[in-house]
Amino acid sequence: MDNVNLTDNFLIAMPTLEDPYFSNALVYICEHNENGALGIIVNRPIDMNLASLLEKIDIKLEAENLADMPVYFGGPVQLDRGFVLHRPIGQWQSTLAINSDVGLTSSRDVLSSVGSAGLPAEILVTLGYAGWDAGQLEEELAQNSWLTVPAKASILFDLPPEERLPAAMQKLGISFTQLSDVAGHA
């Protein structure tokens, strides 16, 4: 498991993962290195839409058609902080390039441009993120807490939240009902 970089991969929570934050979660890994990992849960909309989030932080929504866009629970770390997954990457103040097309931005300027010509074509807005210390994710993988699969931007941006986990699992050729909470080792 050493030297495995899961940046731009999905983590699929196994049934054995009893942490309520991650039960049935699909996590998009935005950064993974020797210092740890950062991911965003992408299938958990919360009871808030983009219009109400922007209103709370005094940003005018330029595009009314985006008002009902859901905001997501991104993970249990820094729940008061917003993160925006977006495509294309663009030129924002604080953007982490995940791949050549998808970025994660935590600066306010990306939200200020919602609905303007400078807005990224596709966005997913979250509050909070999932974080792992150095070696923690690798340990959880060794304990069979997660399945991994290369991510597809179309799953992030083109599917409704309830279809994202099944679509990621389909990439592995399995469905959630086929997963067991009993780990086996050959």
From Swiss-Prot:
Protein name per UniProt: UPF0301 protein Daro_3893
A Pfam family of this chain: DUF179
Family designation: Belongs to the UPF0301 (AlgH) family.
Cystine bridges: none
GO cellular component annotations of the record: cytosol
